[in-house]
A protein has these predicted regions:
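Short, charged, surface-exposed secondary-structure boundary motifs
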Residues: 150-157, 233-240, 253-261
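Active-site rim loops that border cofactor/substrate pockets in soluble metabolic enzymes
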Residues: 148-203, 209
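Short, T/G/N/S-enriched strand-turn elements that build extracellular solenoid repeat scaffolds
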Residues: 212-218
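Short, charged/polar "capping" segments at the starts of alpha-helices
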Residues: 13-16, 64-65, 127-130, 151, ...
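Metallocofactor- and cofactor-centric catalytic cores in central/energy metabolism, strongly enriched
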Residues: 1-113, 137, 203-206, 220-228, ...
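Conserved beta-alpha
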Residues: 94-156
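Short acidic active-site motifs
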Residues: 40-44, 192-193, 213, 233
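Short, polar loop motifs at secondary-structure junctions
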Residues: 60, 125-127, 208-211, 228-232
Length: 298
């Protein structure tokens, strides 16, 4: 039997374990949350790499204050570098595929659902493939990357603008004054701009944790495109008036399986190294599992 562990910086309340036959292999699968403790995460990674055949790492953004993208990228690299004996994955490529798959499923099954919708991405850079997919259905898109990544009070309003920003974002701070961008008045103005953008959107693409600080006035009637939504969070979104949640993380083996954990399971079962699995391989596997994106109504 092969062992797979998914270590998440999310809550330990949602831990689980199960045995299953998967792609011709018998797997023992664990999900372990560390409650945003980097120290505990490192300890678990070092302990489990002596026993696991593959490890998935899920970084949950609750513990980051915006702007945070650079902090997240830095921490992900530090965590993956801890594991040297066995394959380790964040499931980023699979997450992109799952989100695109979910959006196309909704578009086809609910009758041109995203056609001409007003869509706000908290991060276009983190969801570039998804942005390209949604752009096939609507050009009414905006991206909050400058606002949330760099603290600059500006939204991007086209896919071309996002591509230009992605190519040159690292130069922006050369002329921006960090002290000014970090000042309380600028932070308040940025939050006002983000809330205004949410109010004008019909669809919000964001990590579910990043919506915790918004209320019914902001989210009433919205569709949220996200991943790995627990029942507790779904209930809270319902209290805030969210109309529908599109969740790319499939429900398999009686659990919601995060992309990082599912990718680790695939790696362990196939023996392929991270990055060597093709997009078509992932899609074929999802079809074999008879998995479906989750459309949830709070």
């Amino acid at each position: 039997m092969k062992t797979v562990v998914g270590i998440s910086l999310g809550s330990g309340e949602h831990n689980f374990e199960f045995d299953t036959d998967f792609l011709g292999q018998r797997l023992k699968v664990w999900r372990l949350g560390t409650d945003a403790s980097a120290t505990k995460t490192v300890k678990l990674l070092k302990a489990w790499e002596r026993h696991a055949d593959a490890i998935g790492i899920a970084v949950v953004k609750d513990k980051y204050a915006l702007p945070s993208r650079r902090d997240i990228d830095r921490d992900v690299t530090q965590l993956t570098d801890v594991v040297t004996r066995v394959p380790v994955t964040t499931g980023a490529r699979l997450a992109d595929i799952l989100q695109e798959w979910a959006v196309r499923h909704v578009q086809n099954s609910l009758g041109s659902y995203f056609t001409n919708a007003n869509v706000l991405f908290f991060s276009g850079m983190s969801n570039l493939k998804l942005a390209q997919t949604i752009y096939e259905y609507t050009q009414n898109v905006s991206f909050a990357d400058p606002l949330l990544q760099l603290g600059i009070p500006k939204l991007l309003t086209s896919l071309d603008a996002l591509r230009l920003y992605s190519a040159g974002a690292h130069h922006v701070l050369d002329w921006a004054l960090p002290g000014v961008l970090a000042s309380d008045p600028v932070k308040e103005w940025n939050r006002f701009l983000l809330r205004k953008a949410i109010h004008g959107a019909t669809v919000v693409v964001a990590p579910v944790q990043d919506l915790d600080n918004f209320d019914r006035e902001d989210l009433d009637g919205k569709t949220v495109v996200t991943s790995t939504v627990s029942d507790e969070r779904l209930a809270r979104l319902g209290e805030k008036g969210v109309a529908m949640v599109v969740d790319g993380s499939p429900f398999l083996f009686d659990h919601v399986i995060a992309p990082s954990l599912l990718d680790a399971m695939i790696i362990a079962a196939t023996g392929k190294r991270p990055g060597k699995i093709l997009d078509d391989d992932y899609l074929e596997l999802l079809a074999r599992l008879e998995a479906e994106p989750r459309i949830r109504y709070p």
